[in-house]
């Protein structure tokens, strides 16, 4: 590591230690906690997770996919081989009555809505999603709940040993991390005899390992945007081609309103595969003639996800003869770019209940704890960041203003992978934060005690330097002090409503200050300043110079009548914050 990088890292640890009152850099490296560490699940479960972590992790898997991208059939054949070695054939997956969902933003929320709607009918549901926020078992759910540590442990070791026993010289012993969990989910759902499985695509669609599913009941494509460009392509049209790879001959598919280019690609892809593709009407069309629909997830953008989920659930019920019969029929063929409009129907009481009861942590989630309000939304693409800002500003507009002192706004941000942090931060800047805080996706500097939070794909140096780069991007934007308020113009999204946009926050008298911390717990301790009972206040530093922003900001945060903290960017950052704010999630 260069001398400059060494100095940067030393400065970072110094700032973190100053904010927490740790007297040596060694203590900061050890991740000493100022509050009791929540009791971890049984070591047997943790042992299973540690063994899972020894497999090729997601970042390595992405690199492998990039190398093999020219021959997608090889990837799917490899997944089918793993499936066979585990004791299943692709035909066995037909029994799961799968709903297969892809998209760039909103696919997880769409899946959550869909699963909750169908569960409200009394059906036993399986739900496979990624990534996890706090514990890896969140990725595999039965009836909306993560499988228990005991169930995870049982199925993990059963699959692991079966794959070990079937290895030979012609095949690799174990599938990569994500493929292993996909296989495990299929085994869990089959053994636990679910009535249906909602399966969220990992990355893309055409080459994704979930695409060994050959006969889903119905497929869905949520809103498209730019993400994973090194894998999927650098235009929305290229990404749409990848997403359309989950279409199957004769299997109905639904999508929401997209820009003309990617929508045309989806249409052509569906025609080539002989897949009937339908365009979802707006949620307002389904509300006509009845009371408004109440959504369990906040944010105007969730209405698009809910509209798609209603069509997926309605189609599944029809095709399974659970509620009505017959294929979806277009009400007005050729409505838009030669795509038929999906049927407009009156949502049933079960559908309304499912939409209202949907929970999806880390997405437009609000936690209120005394004077602190935490706004959590894992928005890591430009379009998701736009939706996040609209939701955040709308939430602030509807709040009760305190009378006993000033309000403070804090941004807690991190971005990983091939995302463009400068572009994301520019979208967030008009929220007029008083402080911008950056930290890696580490709950503590040392994560050895929690296997669920371990990440072997990057080094500590890499993640710390990336945070410093984020800070530099933010400071550069702050120095310009001329960033236009992007939210005073009409929504760029198809079907968006300018009436939902908020007036700009009155400009502050001074620019936002920025800080970098070495882990999430250090950042949360500084932000909360002892006003959240979970976190002990940082003690005065001994023998170290106090970072001026940390010192001045601490006084302001302690005196504020209300502190609004937006946690966004990486979902893993959101998960780490949730783990610390809600220790029960780790039990």
Swiss-Prot record:
**Names of the cofactor(s):** K(+); NH4(+)
- What influences the activity of this protein, per its activity regulation comment? Activated by 10 mM sodium bicarbonate.
pH behavior is given as: Optimum pH is 9.6 (isoform 2).
Q: Where does Mg(2+) 2 bind?
A: 228
Q: Which UniProt keywords apply?
A: Acetylation, ATP-binding, Cytoplasm, Ligase, Magnesium, Membrane, Metal-binding, Mitochondrion, Mitochondrion inner membrane, Nucleotide-binding, One-carbon metabolism, Phosphoprotein, Transit peptide
Sequence positions that bind Mg(2+) 1: 130, 200
Q: Per the record, GO CC terms?
A: cytoplasm; cytosol; mitochondrial inner membrane; mitochondrial matrix; mitochondrion
Cite the annotated pathway: Cofactor biosynthesis; tetrahydrofolylpolyglutamate biosynthesis
- The answer to keyword Disulfide bond applying to this record is no
Output one GO MF annotation.
Answer: tetrahydrofolylpolyglutamate synthase activity
Effect upon mutating residue 499 to F:
Expression reduced by 2.11-fold; Vmax with methotrexate as substrate is significantly reduced resulting in significantly decreased intrinsic clearance of methotrexate; apparent Vmax for glutamic acid is reduced 5-fold; reaction velocity at 100 nmol/L of pemetrexed is significantly reduced and folic acid dose-response curve is shifted to the right which corresponds to 4.28-fold increase in the EC(50) for folic acid; IC(50) of methotrexate is 1.64-fold higher and accumulation of a lower ratio of long-chain methotrexate polyglutamates to short-chain polyglutamates is detected; all results are for isoform 2 variant in comparison to the wild-type of it
The record places the transit peptide at 1-42
Query: Phosphoserine: which positions carry it?
Result: 539
Query: How cofactor binds (record note)?
Result: A monovalent cation. K(+) is most effective, followed by NH4(+) and Rb(+). Na(+), Li(+) and Cs(+) are ineffective.
For this protein, what reaction is catalysed?
(6S)-5,6,7,8-tetrahydrofolyl-(gamma-L-Glu)(n) + L-glutamate + ATP = (6S)-5,6,7,8-tetrahydrofolyl-(gamma-L-Glu)(n+1) + ADP + phosphate + H(+)
Write out the residues that bind ATP: 106-109, 363, 377
Entry keyword annotation includes Mitochondrion: yes
Q: What is its EC number?
A: 6.3.2.17
Which GO terms are recorded in the biological process aspect for this UniProt protein?
A: cell population proliferation; folic acid metabolic process; folic acid-containing compound metabolic process; glutamate metabolic process; nucleobase-containing compound metabolic process; one-carbon metabolic process; tetrahydrofolylpolyglutamate biosynthetic process
N-acetylmethionine: modified positions: 43
Q: According to the UniProt record, what class of enzyme is this?
A: ligase
What the entry lists under PANTHER family is as follows: FOLYLPOLYGLUTAMATE SYNTHASE, MITOCHONDRIAL, FOLYLPOLYGLUTAMATE SYNTHASE-RELATED
Record's function text: Catalyzes conversion of folates to polyglutamate derivatives allowing concentration of folate compounds in the cell and the intracellular retention of these cofactors, which are important substrates for most of the folate-dependent enzymes that are involved in one-carbon transfer reactions involved in purine, pyrimidine and amino acid synthesis. Unsubstituted reduced folates are the preferred substrates. Metabolizes methotrexate (MTX) to polyglutamates.
Q: Which family does it belong to?
A: Belongs to the folylpolyglutamate synthase family.
User: Which NCBIfam families does the entry mention?
Assistant: folC (TIGR01499)
| Protein name per UniProt | Folylpolyglutamate synthase, mitochondrial
Q: Which organism is it from?
A: Homo sapiens (Human)
Q: Which gene name belongs to this protein? A: FPGS
